[in-house]
Structure formats: C-alpha cells, structure tokens
Amino acid sequence: MSAGSERGAAATPGGLPAPCASKVELRLSCRHLLDRDPLTKSDPSVALLQQAQGQWVQVGRTEVVRSSLHPVFSKVFTVDYYFEEVQRLRFEVYDTHGPSGFSCQEDDFLGGMECTLGQPAQKWLLQVVMRVSVDVLGPAGHCAKHFLCCTESSHLARTGPSFLLRYDDLCLPWATAGAVRWWTCRGGHTQGWQIVAQKKVTRPLLLKFGRNAGKSTITVIAEDISGNNGYVELSFRARKLDDKDLFSKSDPFLELYRVNDDQGLQLVYRTEVVKNNLNPVWEAFKVSLSSLCSCEETRPLKCLVWDYDSRGKHDFIGEFSTTFEEMQKAFEEGQAQWDCVNPKYKQKRRSYKNSGVVVLADLKFHRVYSFLDYIMGGCQIHFTVAIDFTASNGDPRNSCSLHYINPYQPNEYLKALVSVGEICQDYDSDKRFSALGFGARIPPKYEVSHDFAINFNPEDDECEGIQGVVEAYQNCLPRVQLYGPTNVAPIISKVARVAAAEESTGKASQYYILLILTDGVVTDMADTREAIVRASRLPMSIIIVGVGNADFTDMQVLDGDDGVLRSPRGEPALRDIVQFVPFRELKNASPAALAKCVLAEVPKQVVEYYSHRGLPPRSLGVPAGEASPGCTP
C-alpha cells in the first residue's frame, strides 16, 4: 500500500463551485514502473496535459507517491467535457526529484500515454489507443498482417509492417455508440466483434520513439459527475493510535475508500501525514458526493489508517467500515466515532479491542445547483435591450447607415436583437421586454436623452415579445434625431435599480439581462465602469454587442476576461458580468451560433450570483443557510 506525499491531495481539485460545464473526473494508478533510483524505488507523479491549438499544455499534476513502483494517486483531475470538440489528453509519468506538484528538469521520464475524451452510450470514458489487425493481400497472393493503432495524425504513417492511425479519425459509420469494433480484412471481406466500452482503461506506458517502458502500465478511471448534486466537507481526527515506531511515535495518515460494485476499492482521498502524533487531527477536505459514494448514501466506505514510512513500507494501524448515511446519522447524534481495528490482532488476541479510535470531527453536506435548477425552480429572466441612436450610425434614410431599414434584409441591430432576444424570451413567462434608446434627440422638445423608451411611453417601456421590440425600433427611427454622445451608464444604472429591488426579496425569482447594441466605444467610460462595478453585486448581466466596423479595442476593458474590472476609485467588481462581442466577427454566422456566443457566459453568471448570496432555487424550499449553489449542468 502506498501513501502520498506528506501533504494530502484533494479529490476534487479547485474551489467550489466550478464553472458551468459537463464534468469528468479522472483517477490514476500505475503498475510496474521503471525504477530510476539506484538506492531506493522511484518517487512517481503524473502530469496531465491537454492539447490546445496544436500545443500540449500542462493542466495539472498529481502528488508524489514516495518510493513506489505501483502508485495509486489520490489527486483527482476534473476535466471539462465538450461534445463538439476532440479533446486530446496526455499522461506523463515522472520519477520526481522536485517538490510535490511541480516539475523539475532533473525529473526522470518513466513513460506516457495519449488518448482522447469521449462520450459513448452516455457514459464518460477514455477512447484510447486501439490496435486493429488488417490482413492485406499482396501482389503474389501472399497475405501480410498489419496493425492500425492510435497516433497523433489522421494520415497513415508506415513503420515496418505497421500503419499508425488514430481510432477517432477513422470516422467509421459502423462504429456504434457504447462499443468499439475490431475488424479483420481479407481480400475485401470483413468480419468483426465488439469490445464493450468501459470506464476503466489500462494501457502500457511508452517512452520516446514509441518504445515500451518495460511492463509499465497506467490505469485511468473516468467517471461522469454531471449529475452530481452536491459535495461533502469532512474532517477526521484520531486518538490513542498504536505506536509503530521504536524511537518515536507513529506518523499517521488516513485513506478513505469507496467500495465499488465489483467489491474493489476506489481511493477517494488520502490525508496529509501528521508527524510523531498518536492523537492526530487531519485537515478538513472536500469531495463530491459522486466521488465519495457514487451519489448512493448506502454504498459501503472503508477507512484505513497507516503509519507513514519514507521508504514506502507503511505500517498498517487499523481500519473500519461505514456508509455516508451512517456517518450523517452518527454525526447528528454526536456519536461519530469508530474503533480502528487491525484484523490480525483481533484474530490473535482475545482481549484486543482496537488500535485506536477515529472520530468524524465535522461533516457538512452542500447542495450544488445548476442554471437549469434555477430556471426550473421558477427563476425568470427579464430582458432589456438598449439601442445606440447616436449620429455615428449614419442617417437612417441612407443605405450605408447601420440603422437603414432594408425591406429584404435586416440590419445588424435587428440581427443581434432577434438572435439574442428569441433565446431570452423562452425564459420569461410574460414575454414582455423593456426597450430603451440612448444618444438621440427625442420629441417633443428634441433634447438629448441617454435613457428613453423607444415606444415613447415612459410609464411602460415594455414591448410584447421580440416582434414588439422590432416594431417599436422601426417606428422610433423616423421620430428621433440621431445625436450623441455614446453614454451607457444611465441605462445600466436604470436596470440596476430594478435589479436592486429584486435583490431585497432574498429569493431566486428574477434575473436581469441588459443587451446594449452600440456602434462605437462608450464616451462615459469612467461612469460606465462605476455602474458595472455596482451592478456586479446585483442579479444582473450585461451583454454589449458592437455593430459596424469601428475599433472596439477600448471596449475590451469592460469585459473582465483579462482581469478584474475596477471602478475609477479602485473598487473591484464582485463578479464578471459583462460579455463584449464584436458583431462583425459573427455577421456571417447563423442566428443560433450568434446567440450561443453572445449568451455563453450567462448561465455561469446566474449561478455565481445565487451562489454568492447562498440562495437555492425557489421550488426546492431549502433554507438559504444550507444552500451551496454551484454549477453543474
């Protein structure tokens, strides 16, 4: 049995909640690794790399397992999954000489394995290197056996009697979901059989130039956690553990395992080592409910306690079994403790009671809510559109104007408005939208206004559906004089006042989206930054679509992708609530593609807001103090 480094490795990396994406958890173990150390065994760790734009980028690294050729890693990688993308992964195993979690030039490469992430039969797994035998009929009727297997390129590369081909690139129409077919070809005739796709994959490690790393293998277990509805925070301590050291006290650490359906043990978490202590208090840790018990509270769990040895020969102290259901009940009753039992001692000694006691010091269960949870719980999306009527758009009567109404083709304002609005209206029960304008002289006095209703009804600026907004926009154009400047802070502040009233209710009932359509950089940048920072604390998102061919470089500062937006006074935004999209980059895209790009960040922003406020979906009726919203689709 191997332990990790003296610092524990979390089973759910990163903070919670996570961003909105389908999630796959990857667990790693290796067998028969090469031994690069002359006096001791290798100290392995695994780096996970993901291919982005043709380059391999390291996204994480496991802990170091000291002095082990058969490591089981506690670190769990959580990978975002996108159905429409080919996501290439590479696992590299090193004999580590630097600090845990960091690469170092002196690290010895022990082998690697490449694969892709896939979704057959609605189960997450790794599509790995496949070897397909092919009998090719030679010119004299002689048959030569060839093998097709995964490589980086989609084209064939001949190496001796082998062809190298990535399985994903075969694009075979007969490859059914949930299975991989192996086919043998002879003289144009085919026969095949199925290998049922599994979530556990074991493959050999390869050195440079494709050489096998001895008998070394890596096992990757992939698990879908998209349906995960919570995470658990646990804290353990122990008392009166057996002393396994002659001249000092034990150095205990604890391992928590889940018992799988095949009765095999899956490592969930490994604590840090507490030095020279028979009454250790281990640091609290978080694991997803899926990782802990596959979201089955009655699934058996097993805890093992060890005395750490730097050479990897850890001394077994004891163990106990439980379930998450039992842990919750015992903790509520104040009796969450278990005898730490060594079965060998129990069998040999009649008077033996235990090798110490393990106590569950703290248990917190946090529900995790998704964007759909809030929508299905009754949260309404209120949509407001603000249209730029400044003179820089050009005279609407001129066909070169961005506001020109062509009877045969919508202008850019209408394209953006309809594409985004048709999506938003599906989340609003009354289908009524506020429609505002800015930068124009309006009747009757023709004074410049940066906040006017385009239906010219200041008491009710809402229109019936997106078609009502389109009609109000078309009717408004001949009645106003395009002017300036491009001030948007007044409209942001107006919507923010409505959102502030909603915030005071303490319910997840209304969320506000402000769509600003403009042809240039805003003039009141300082006031706009101030208004956005204030709005970041409210149930509100802002989407800015730049129409026309102006230089929108300065607008990127409002989108917090390059850093936290700050007000002129230096106050940071609580959340990134602004998405800026230049329309010219999407003008030839379909309405669906435009809407997808423009609205991509909204689900995440909705969940982040309610997560910060600790508000559950309304229909669930969970007390706010118990809610821990997160983002799992």
UniProtKB/Swiss-Prot annotation:
- Keyword set includes Transmembrane: no
Query: Ranges for the VWFA domain?
Result: 382-581
Database matches in CDD domains: C2A_Copine, C2B_Copine, vWA_copine_like
Stretches assigned to the C2 domain: 2-133, 212-339
Keywords in alphabetical order, please: Calcium, Cell membrane, Cytoplasm, Membrane, Metal-binding, Nucleus, Repeat
Please indicate which superkingdom the organism of origin belongs to: Eukaryota
| The keyword Transmembrane helix is annotated on this UniProt entry | no
Give its localization: Cytoplasm; Nucleus; Cell membrane
Q: Which Gene3D superfamilies match?
A: C2 domain (2.60.40.150), von Willebrand factor, type A domain (3.40.50.410)
Q: Which InterPro entries match?
A: C2_dom, C2_domain_sf, C2B_Copine, Copine, Copine_C, VWF_A, vWFA_dom_sf
The cross-references to PROSITE patterns, in alphabetical order and at most eight, read: C2, VWFA
Listed binding positions for Ca(2+) 1 are 245, 251, 307, 309
- Cellular-component GO terms for this entry: cytoplasm; extracellular exosome; nucleus; plasma membrane; synapse
Cofactor(s) listed: Ca(2+)
Q: What tissue expression does the UniProt record report for this protein?
A: Expressed in the brain, testis, thymus and small intestine.
Q: Which GO terms describe its molecular function?
A: calcium-dependent phospholipid binding; metal ion binding
Entry domain remark: The C2 domain 1 is not necessary for calcium-mediated translocation and association to the plasma membrane. The C2 domain 2 is necessary for calcium-mediated translocation and association to the plasma membrane.
**Which protein, by its recorded name, is this?**
Copine-7
What organism is the protein native to? Homo sapiens
